[in-house]
Amino acid sequence: MLNGILYILNMLLLFALFLSYASPYISPDTFLWPIALLGLIYPFLLLINCLFALYWIIRFKKYVWTNIIIILLGYAHIKNLIIIQKNQTSTDSQFTIMSYNVRLFNAYDWINKDNVKEDIIEYVNNESPSVLCLQEFYAPKELPKFNYPFSHIGLQNERKSWRMATYSKFPVFNKGTVSISGERTNNVCIYSDIVIGEDSIRVYNAHLASNWFQKEDYEFLDRPTVEGAESIIERLKVSFFKRAKQVKAIKAHMNTSPNPIILCGDFNDTPTSFTYKQLSEGLNDSFANAGLGIGQTYNGKFPALRIDYILYSPELEIVNFKTSEVSLSDHYPIISAFN
């Protein structure tokens, strides 16, 4: 009786896992948007079905083969989720780049800690990446004192204190903005053409549509309700739709770039998503090629989410990648080294 119930539950979850594999290929701005929800929870579907496979092995049941086959069909997604062995092609690098959503430097006291802004500035200056890309950059009065001779500060919304910032130790000879505004215009993508040695690269710094979860949405994790689930699903649906339009605009602009590209920022979406699939086409993923572990970049109540990225053109050589678990924002900074 118990095995029969577990088998039915397992088959339903395997079907959900199988459907999640389609998430990167289906635009969420269609009636098939629920597939994007399955892509979002792919890591959890994978874990649950792996546990079912282990259970069937222990019980000596042939059902295990169905689990193994469906799980292995998603091998490409597993490779983007978990890196078991770190690749490092060289110990020398020509330049480094950091991407960091600083969450307005804790302007609204989300973190119960003093001097968060000063701590972020100190951390960044100590790391001293060659190129620094900041999202949710808050500067109501004066710009923070980062140690860089060149910069591109773009507005993130109509409030002139909300910005995007790209700092560089190398000369910036051209810069601009990709128009991706939506209903709430706090999403933006800026680009900077930078001279490194005798070569030039274009660095895109993007912040895509947030899910805009409220306090009561996070409380759903502790006290699940039907109303709470409906609220979260509706917010996700809206943000999926917005990001689908935003990535198309960014991708079209990247196709016009005369230089090799580095695209970094807060995508607010996972590797098993339409967003990631579209933006990573023709580019390499720093974490996938030089990272280790699960690469979690979101520092919040939803664990194991990788939503911040540094993608790069094949002409560039990745040397190293790391995620710094610095708890000064709801995101962790990520750093890549290149030749």
Spans of features found by a protein language model:
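N-terminal, active-site-proximal structural segment of metallo-dependent hydrolase catalytic domains
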Residues: 1-145
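Metal-dependent phosphoester-hydrolase catalytic domains
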Residues: 4-18, 22-35, 39-56, 62-68, ...
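Active-site beta-strand/loop signature of hydrolases that rely on acidic residues for catalysis
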Residues: 22, 96-102, 116, 120-142, ...
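Structured beta-strand-rich core segments of catalytic domains in phosphoester-bond hydrolases
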Residues: 44, 71-92, 118-121, 130-216, ...
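Acidic/histidine-rich helix-loop elements
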Residues: 100-115, 212-239
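Active-site environment of divalent metal-dependent phosphoester hydrolases
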Residues: 104-108, 138-142, 159-161, 186, ...
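Extracytoplasmic/periplasmic, Sec-exported soluble proteins
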Residues: 112, 116, 155-159, 184, ...
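Short, glycine/charged-enriched secondary-structure capping and boundary segments
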Residues: 112-114, 146-149, 218-219, 276-280, ...
